[in-house]
């Protein structure tokens, strides 16, 4: 009887992905090179007394342990397409799940309009500056250049996933090489350079462009701290957070991986800890190469109010610091560019995939129009969903370039996801073993016997995860240092939640008019 309430008897998807495909989806959503760039720039422009190394270690001890457990166990217990919507609608309530995922989809669109512009700035702009191509750098950073490049990457991402998950998997495996390799080259350049050599390289550029030498640059940035404190170190969660949380994208492939009980947990662990290791090596390398207040001045110049008198033609962010450290090496310049191309390409691709799978899951539960459940028998792909998502991405890139551009867009989009995706799903992870309505799902879970001192491991993981999430939300949206920058965007968050809840009640009422009681579907898993 229950299966009659679902819109289809089967999802139409095919289980053909392996653990490396799952890992790749999580890692590419983290976007290692971009995460390292934003980690330093956002954290230290807002909280200049923050110690990145300590912030990463604290994050690793909480979210680094909790995130893979929560997402790996929930997805392995409920291996269906649709991500956190499936878990939260069963464990908590479908209205909460739809409000949360509605907001996540808005955040994904916003995030990826921003990410699509990265092909122009910083990737190609910095590369052109490093190569001395002033005209090229100016064009890729112009509104026209940003829009054209952003549109190209959206279309390429769409074509990479719309007709075949096999082609997506092949492309992703290839792109993992420059995505990880570029970060390793960047970090190696920093670790191989002494402070004396870096200062010499920096001062040579200052002389060439009549800019500020090393000491003058620090002085011009103002009275920046020379050591760290606990407040700003916890505040640095606003920058390092992306190392720990974007493994969640793997959940959207849950209905398409082989051996989900093992594949999903292993993929989640790798997708969190590879970025953590890269982040730790970068942070410790930077403190080895430059003074604490120089790093703060670099963040202020590239992500903050700027530094008066700095006239070199490139932003002094962590990417440029690595290139300068290498003696302006072409290998480092190409490594940065290729790493950005890889993560931008795959992140846009995965974002389109996520939205298509989310709408499919809604449709299966009769929480959306019938075409949400249309899956091509030939390609095993929800082509209509993916096409609509691609069009919204393309239109949104234009809107973003013209009106919405902000260097803190990632923090704003990430904040929306922290509440709607990570906080809500963390709560679901804590409650999963104890909710009567999903007792049958928990009893069938391969992780039901995993306990420490009698407490289910998923509950422990959820608590650790929530500790990090709550701290990050406070320092990114409540603390006086950041709230004036990010708080004004909370109205978008509230509107998205309201729209998702209204959406749920509309479709529930519509199904009731057709004589279908959809409430019975939310105590069990949707069709495979």
Kindly label every feature range from the protein language model.
Residues 9-16, 83, 163-174, 244-283, ...:
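Hydrophobic, small-residue-rich membrane helices and short re-entrant helix-turn-helix hairpins
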Residues 1-54, 63-66, 205-212, 508-528:
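Membrane-interface "cap" regions at the ends of multi-pass membrane proteins
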Residues 31, 39, 55, 179-182, ...:
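A generic transmembrane alpha-helix motif of multi-pass inner-membrane proteins
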Residues 20, 109, 143-151, 257-261, ...:
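Loop-to-transmembrane helix boundary motifs in multi-pass membrane proteins
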Residues 135-144, 174-328:
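Helix-loop-helix junctions that connect adjacent transmembrane segments
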Residues 86-88, 93, 129, 214-220, ...:
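TM-loop-TM module centered on a large, flexible mid-protein loop between adjacent transmembrane helices
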Residues 42, 55, 61, 65-154, ...:
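Hydrophobic transmembrane alpha-helices that form the core helical bundles
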């Amino acid at each position: 009887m229950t299966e009659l309430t679902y819109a289809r008897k089967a999802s139409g998807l095919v289980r053909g992905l392996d653990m490396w495909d799952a890992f790749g989806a999580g890692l590419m959503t983290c976007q290692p090179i971009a995460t390292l760039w934003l980690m330093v720039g956002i954290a230290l422009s807002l909280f200049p007394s923050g110690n990145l190394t300590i912030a990463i270690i604290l994050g690793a001890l909480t979210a680094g342990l909790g995130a893979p457990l929560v997402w790996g166990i929930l997805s392995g217990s409920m291996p269906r397409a649709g991500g956190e919507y499936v878990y939260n609608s069963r464990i908590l309530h479908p209205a909460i799940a739809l409000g949360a995922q509605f907001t996540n989809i808005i955040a994904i669109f916003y995030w990826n309009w921003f990410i699509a512009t990265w092909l122009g700035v910083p990737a190609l702009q910095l590369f052109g500056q490093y190569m001395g191509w002033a005209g090229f750098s100016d064009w890729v950073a112009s509104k026209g250049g940003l829009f054209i490049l952003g549109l190209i990457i959206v279309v390429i991402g769409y074509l990479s996933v719309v007709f075949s998950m096999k082609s997506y998997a092949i492309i992703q495996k290839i792109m993992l090489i420059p995505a990880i390799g570029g970060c390793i080259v960047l970090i190696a350049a920093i670790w191989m350079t002494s402070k004396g050599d870096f200062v010499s390289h920096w001062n040579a550029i200052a002389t060439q462009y009549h800019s500020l030498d090393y000491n003058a640059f620090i002085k011009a940035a103002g009275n920046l701290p020379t050591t760290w404190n606990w407040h700003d170190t916890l505040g640095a969660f606003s920058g390092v957070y992306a190392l720990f949380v974007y493994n969640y994208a793997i959940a959207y492939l849950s209905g398409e991986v082989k051996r989900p009980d093992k594949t999903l947990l292993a993929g989640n662990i790798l997708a969190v800890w590879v970025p953590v290791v890269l982040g730790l090596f970068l942070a410790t390398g930077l403190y080895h190469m430059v003074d604490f207040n120089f790093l703060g001045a670099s963040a202020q110049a590239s992500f903050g109010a700027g530094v008066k008198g700095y006239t070199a033609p490139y932003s002094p962010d962590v990417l440029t610091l690595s290139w300068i450290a290498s003696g302006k090496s072409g290998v480092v310049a190409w490594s940065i560019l290729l790493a950005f191309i890889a993560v931008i390409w795959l992140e846009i691709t995965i974002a389109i995939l996520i939205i298509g799978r989310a709408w499919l899951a809604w449709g299966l539960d009769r929480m959306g129009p019938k075409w949400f459940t249309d899956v091509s028998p030939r390609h095993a792909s929800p082509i209509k969903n993916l096409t609509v998502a691609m069009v919204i991405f393309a239109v949104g890139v234009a809107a973003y370039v013209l009106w919405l551009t902000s260097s803190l867009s990632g923090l704003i989009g990430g904040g929306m996801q922290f509440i709607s995706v990570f906080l809500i799903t963390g709560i679901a992870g804590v409650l999963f073993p104890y909710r009567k309505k999903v007792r049958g799902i928990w009893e069938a879970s391969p992780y039901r016997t995993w306990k420490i001192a009698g407490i289910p491991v998923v509950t422990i993981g959820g608590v650790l995860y929530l500790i990090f999430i709550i701290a990050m939300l406070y320092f990114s949206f409540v603390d006086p240092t950041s709230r004036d920058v990010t708080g004004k965007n909370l109205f978008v968050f509230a509107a998205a939640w309201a729209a998702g809840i209204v959406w749920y009640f509309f479709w529930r009422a519509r199904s009731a008019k057709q004589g279908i009681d959809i409430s019975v579907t939310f105590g069990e898993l949707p069709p495979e």
